[in-house]
Amino acid sequence: MSTFKSLSLSALLFIAFLFTCARGATFNIINNCPFTVWAAAVPGGGKRLDRGQNWIINPGAGTKGARVWARTGCNFDGAGRGKCQTGDCNGLLQCQAFGQPPNTLAEYALNQFNNLDFFDISLVDGFNVAMEFSPTSGGCTRGIKCTANINEQCPNELRAPGGCNNPCTVFKTDQYCCNSGNCGPTDYSRFFKTRCPDAYSYPKDDQTSTFTCPGGTNYKVVFCP
């Protein structure tokens, strides 16, 4: 029994040690667009950013399934209720849920396998503004960008007010949505991939689209880099 207690205590101390060593991150979200955006983050909320303004968020260690995006064409009242043309999150300035397509996404998970952060830019929900997602500390230097003018080049059938839809949003078929978990690239995903090779162009585009940095790295997300 004493041996079991010792092992249990050791396990708890080890878990506590790992938890103590894991550090969250600081994200500097910057608007370089020549127009106002309403930055959104889950977790984090939301903030209006005029050109040149920034917003700092501090997600905790172990945060996963998180994303940052820009909303455009928004109007909010004094209570923070309104609507956005792209990226709207249930009509709230302070987002509590993911945004409506089309919107360019910065996605991340902190302190995961081997205490690595995983991050990506995704066009699986379409595109609304150009984006950079880059580490700013920790000796990690590989940043990623999607800077093509996709809205102007968007195929007619994918066009939306203020953005360019992913085909899943428009056609809602397994070929494009990958509901079965078994799908490959399509002509539409190649359209996105050739213009933004660092970004996810369809749900299974993992091999060339997921990047890592050591846990505790800080990052910047730039709209219109």
Curated annotation (Swiss-Prot):
It comes from the Eukaryota. InterPro entries: Osmotin/thaumatin-like_sf, Thaumatin, Thaumatin_CS. GO terms for cellular component: extracellular region. It is found in: Secreted. Disulfide bonds join C33-C224, C74-C84, C89-C95, C140-C213, C146-C196, C154-C164, C168-C177, C178-C183. N-glycosylated. Residues 1-24 form the signal peptide. GO terms for biological process: defense response to fungus; killing of cells of another organism. Keywords: Allergen, Antimicrobial, Disulfide bond, Fungicide, Glycoprotein, Pathogenesis-related protein, Plant defense, Secreted, Signal. It holds the Pfam family Thaumatin. SMART domains: THN. Belongs to the thaumatin family. Has antifungal activity against B.cinerea, C.comatus, M.arachidicola, P.piricola, C.albicans and S.carlsbergensis. Inhibits HIV-1 reverse transcriptase. This is Thaumatin-like protein.
